[in-house]
UniProtKB/Swiss-Prot annotation:
Keyword Oxidoreductase in annotation: no
Protein name: Probable scoulerine-9-O-methyltransferase OMT2B
An annotated GO BP: methylation
Source organism (scientific name): Papaver somniferum
Active site annotation, chain numbering: 263 (proton acceptor)
EC category name: transferase
Length: 356
């Protein structure tokens, strides 16, 4: 049977899509490698808008202390260019490299950086669990997540035993806060009107609360988290740290903040926690402020794809879930709140405010 050119082109498109998905781990490996070699920081720290490939190869260093092979470095950089993380040019017949807007979020010691998220997500303890995704799909909601079956304990329990793992988790959350801070502060302006005390439940090292009390100095801020988290937290002006179990007791405040907490749990645990939060705020003017993802199943944008990726991550590694608007409505109603509102912001999460 004769194959028409249009069909050949369409089949080639399908093949290309499958090959890209087959080799999908290359993206994550290349990104991690670029950070390990310090490629993005080397370009940024040069003080020039672009540097030659020769200059780059002389600056970056391999974790094994071996010298960099320029030809292999070019092949890596060429792939980073396809990922829109490096821009390749030419000057005096020599290849040059420069940062893109995307890679500027992968620099160390910057106000906005997601580098610690990369290091946490791609660490060996996380990667090995992905090999058990098929088992995770068949795991009932009332059974421990696959992460616990692989490592013997859940992520929070391991964080209490291994300081390096605890640091990895909390540095990742601080990294996310650095990126979402402007949108958070802008989105919380009206919400925090009249609020004089705020407690961040499961607030880690307090980066989010530090930003809030800096922007709203009239607020008395506190963070409650597990003892090993609080012990490792740095001192932050205007932020009080409280050791405790958030499922047992939450200090009273005008408002409670839950940032990336509820997505770690199934509905039963979330309802119990939300009820605790509801008890901690005034019945007449209290607020429970949730910062979490809201998935739109009808949206096929790159943002939704990122949210769905995180949904599978929390399913596989923590036993939780990301939620749609309908999911949030049901969860908040089951927790006994009278009403809620969802406020989109210019960041991955939305702000969800539940009123007693």
């Amino acid at each position: 049977m004769e194959i028409h050119l249009e069909s050949q082109e369409q089949e080639m498109k399908y093949q290309s899509q499958i090959w890209n998905q087959i080799c999908g781990t290359v993206d994550t490996s290349v990104l991690r490698c670029a950070i390990q070699l310090g490629i993005f920081d080397a370009i940024h720290n040069s003080g020039k808008p672009m540097i030659t490939l020769t200059e780059l190869s002389s600056i970056v260093s391999s974790p094994s202390s071996s010298s960099i092979e320029p030809c292999n470095l070019y092949r890596l950089v060429r792939y980073l260019s396809q990922m829109d993380l490096i821009s390749i040019g030419e000057c005096l017949n020599e290849a040059t490299v420069s940062l893109t807007g995307t890679s500027k979020l992968l620099l160390r010691n910057q106000e906005k950086s997601l580098i610690d998220w990369v290091l946490a997500i791609y660490c060996e303890m996380m990667v090995v669990v992905w090999h058990e995704l098929s088992s995770s799909v068949s795991t009932p909601a009332d059974e421990p997540p696959i992460f616990q079956k692989v490592h013997g304990k859940n992520a929070l329990e391991l964080a209490g035993e291994f300081p390096e793992w605890n640091d990895l988790i909390n540095n990742a959350m601080t990294s996310d806060t650095s990126v979402t801070k402007p949108a958070l502060i802008q989105g919380c302006g009206k919400i925090l009107n009249g609020v004089t005390s705020l407690i961040d439940v499961g607030g880690g090292h307090g980066a989010t609360m530090a930003y809030i009390v800096e922007a709203f100095p009239h607020i008395k801020g506190a963070v409650i988290d597990l003892p090993h988290v609080v012990e490792a937290a740095p001192e932050r002006p205007g932020v009080e740290f409280i050791s405790g179990d958030i499922f047992k007791s939450i200090s009273n405040a005008d408002a409670v903040l839950l940032k990336y907490v509820l997505h770690n749990w199934e509905d039963t645990e979330c309802v119990n926690l939300l009820k605790r939060c509801k008890e901690a705020v005034p019945a007449d003017k209290g607020k429970v402020i949730i910062m979490d993802l809201v998935i739109d199943d009808d949206d096929n944008s790159i943002l939704t794809q990122a949210k769905l990726s995180l949904d599978l991550t929390v399913m596989n590694h923590g036993g939780g879930r990301e939620r749609t608007k309908e999911d949030w409505r049901n969860l908040i109603e089951m927790s006994g709140f009278s009403r809620h509102e969802i406020i989109p912001i210019s960041a991955m999460p939305s702000i969800i405010v539940a009123y007693p």
